[in-house]
Each structure stands twice: as C-alpha cells, then as structure tokens.
C-alpha cells in the first residue's frame, strides 16, 4: 500500500472533476479524498496499491469529458489509511 498526493492542473473545476475522480477512485478500490484548490487546480490524496495508483494516474491524465488536463503532479506521502474516498469542500 502507498499514499500519493496528486495535483491536477488545467480546466479541472466546474467540469465534475471531483465527483468523477471519486467514482474512478472508488471503482479502483482506492481510499482518500479530493478537493478544489483556490488557484483552480484539483488536489487529491489516495491510498492503494501501485497498480491501483497506475490506473488512477492514467485516468487523471485525461479526466472527465469536459476537462482539459494540462499537468498532473504526483508526490509520495507517508502511508495514511482512510475510510472510503471523500469529496472535501
């Protein structure tokens, strides 16, 4: 298990990115959270296996249909165990 922080930049707010990310993370069996940033990016922290993270990272590179992803930054974090995958407001 590993915990990774993702920062997704581009047109990622107002396009259902958080809700779509929550659904994708849950479908992959990841736990964690996702939130909008004040600067227009989306940030998430997720815990799961390397394979789960690889699938999520591939999805984040495109995002939902109305999004335009310019960049995804991944940072390894200390392991955190979450209950479910939440949207933070």
Curated annotation (Swiss-Prot):
GO terms for molecular function: acylphosphatase activity. Its EC number is 3.6.1.7. Residues 3-89 form the Acylphosphatase-like domain. The keyword Hydrolase applies. Gene3D superfamilies: 3.30.70.100. Coiled coil: none annotated. It comes from the Bacteria. Keywords: Hydrolase. Belongs to the acylphosphatase family. PANTHER family: ACYLPHOSPHATASE, ACYLPHOSPHATASE-RELATED. This is Acylphosphatase.
């Amino acid at each position: 298990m590993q915990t990774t922080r993702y920062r997704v930049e581009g047109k990622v707010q107002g396009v259902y990115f958080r809700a779509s990310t929550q659904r994708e993370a849950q479908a992959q069996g990841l736990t964690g959270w996702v939130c909008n940033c004040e600067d227009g990016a989306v940030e998430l922290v997720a815990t799961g296996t390397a394979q789960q993270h690889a699938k999520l990272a591939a999805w984040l590179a495109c995002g939902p249909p109305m999004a335009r992803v310019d960049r995804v930054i991944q940072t390894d974090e200390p392991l955190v165990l979450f209950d479910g995958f939440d949207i933070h407001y």
